[in-house]
Amino acid sequence: MRCLPVFVILLLLIPSAPCVDAHPKTKDDMPLASFHDNAKGTLQRFWKKRGCCPKQMRCCTLG
């Protein structure tokens, strides 16, 4: 029972530990929002080329 308070204190300290990035940022790193914008733009171009409507994906024919 003596270990329980120590265990609880350690659990409380874990979330307050400072965050450390596993990999340092490089000049090639891209923000996630920019990645999503690029993916969205690519999908919109694909839909326009295929004559698809984005709300009804089943109207798209691949191939």
Curated annotation (Swiss-Prot):
Where in this chain does the entry annotate a coiled-coil region? none
Signal peptide range equals 1-19
Name-wise, this protein is: Conotoxin p5a
Q: Name one GO cellular component term.
A: extracellular region
Q: Give residue numbers for the modification (Leucine amide).
A: L62
Q: In which tissues is it expressed?
A: Expressed by the venom duct.
UniProt free text on domains: The cysteine framework is V (CC-CC).
Propeptide intervals in chain numbering = 20-50
Which cysteines share a disulfide bond?
A: C52-C59, C53-C60
Q: Which organism is it from?
A: Conus purpurascens (Purple cone)
Instruction: List the Gene Ontology MF annotations in alphabetical order.
Output: toxin activity
**Compartment(s):** Secreted
Protein role:
In vivo, low levels of the peptide injected into male specimens of the Siamese fighting fish causes an immediate aggressive display in this fish in response to their reflection when placed in a mirrored aquarium; High levels of the peptide suppressed this behavior. No effect is observed when injected into mice.
Q: Which InterPro entries match?
A: T-conotoxin (IPR031565)
Q: According to its UniProt record, which protein family does this protein belong to?
A: Belongs to the conotoxin T superfamily.
* Alphabetic keyword roster: Amidation, Cleavage on pair of basic residues, Disulfide bond, Neurotoxin, Secreted, Signal, Toxin
